[in-house]
Amino acid sequence: MTNIRKTHPLLKIVNHSLIDLPTPSNISAWWNFGSLLGLCLIIQILTGLFLAMHYTSDTLTAFSSVTHICRDVNYGWLIRYLHANGASMFFICLYMHVGRGIYYGSYTYLETWNIGIILLFAVMATAFMGYVLPWGQMFFWGATVITNLLSAIPYIGTTLVEWIWGGFSVDKATLTRFFAFHFILPFIIAALVMVHLLFLHETGSNNPSGIPSDSDKIPFHPYYTIKDALGFLALILLLLLLVLFSPDLLGDPDNYTPANPLNTPPHIKPEWYFLFAYAILRSIPNKLGGVLALVMSILILAIIPLLHXSKQRSMMFRPISQVLXWVLVADLLTLTWIGGQPVEXPFITIGQVASILYFSIILILMPLASLIENKILKW
């Protein structure tokens, strides 16, 4: 008698995705981030659902409803901080996942990669809209500044911004629609994740060497289910350490002041996970140029597969590219630091240099390094 998991129409899908899936035998811990992102998404949807039960999306009561959640709801403080810091863990895993893709050449799976870029944009949009909801000072001014960037679009910009706001400033209409979108987007993300996995399972996983591993595959269960479970434990431990010991470590003190349209905070800055893009935006003195650079800082990921000039897929055996990739990581950390600093010298110059370096590494230096390494191979 054949096993029910191999014959049942629904269980068959689960079986082919999580149990009998042929997986390369040498994938490292860098391949754990996909499943960790799945866990983050589940945590965010569940905590978000419980927060939505007590939250009110009205400018007069939004701030006090969040206070009410933290003070009066059973374990409301825990749910709220799990959700807020869960977002930080989500982005840590996202950036690691994308970095892994760049380092090991996973971007050659074009469909998977492009769906991944769409997912990244969707998660960033969701995080931004969720950031506005508690209606504190930085939440409000962050929303005002970032949505206002769209006014840089020629001809239709101002109309577009007022259309998004639902008025002439960030107000009740904006808050209500942001709450609606923030609620629906995670489910769209979950659907996109399914498509992402569908395309991945068409080709199978890449591995650190970048060499096809068809001759050496092992079943996903039990080998990688247990490995993922270890990753889950590590992630949950980190998240709980953050939530239970310093829940406000990554937040902004300004957000404990209710939103006031008449009082601008001295330094407007987004959450830490957007600081690198914010630094790139600020390093260009022209508004439209800054907005284009901001969009390109993420959209550049779509160009990476076109610039893959190396004869090898992974960077595992390419020392020059390896150095460049780690310089890119250092550069992104520098940009993140600069994004949180006030706009004055020397930070302006450092930000501009780091921004130029960011685009140079991806567009010029990495393809050049690949060509040099190809030459070295011939010698």
Curated annotation (Swiss-Prot):
Binds 2 heme b groups non-covalently. GO terms for cellular component: mitochondrial inner membrane; respiratory chain complex III. Heme b b562 binds at residues 83, 182. A ubiquinone binds at residue 201. The chain crosses the membrane at residues 33-53, 77-98, 113-133, 178-198, 226-246, 288-308, 320-340, 347-367. It is found in: Mitochondrion inner membrane. GO terms for biological process: mitochondrial electron transport, ubiquinol to cytochrome c. It holds the Pfam family Cytochrom_B_C. InterPro entries: Cyt_b/b6_C (IPR005798), Cyt_b/b6_C_sf (IPR036150), Cyt_b/b6_N (IPR005797), Cytb/b6-like_sf (IPR027387), Cytochrome_b (IPR030689), Cytochrome_b_C_euk/bac (IPR048260), Cytochrome_b_N_euk/bac (IPR048259), Di-haem_cyt_TM (IPR016174). Heme b b566 binds at residues 97, 196. PROSITE patterns: CYTB_CTER, CYTB_NTER. It is a multi-pass membrane protein. Its cofactor is heme b. Component of the ubiquinol-cytochrome c reductase complex (complex III or cytochrome b-c1 complex) that is part of the mitochondrial respiratory chain. The b-c1 complex mediates electron transfer from ubiquinol to cytochrome c. Contributes to the generation of a proton gradient across the mitochondrial membrane that is then used for ATP synthesis. Heme 1 (or BL or b562) is low-potential and absorbs at about 562 nm, and heme 2 (or BH or b566) is high-potential and absorbs at about 566 nm. This is Cytochrome b. It comes from Sylvilagus aquaticus. The gene is MT-CYB.
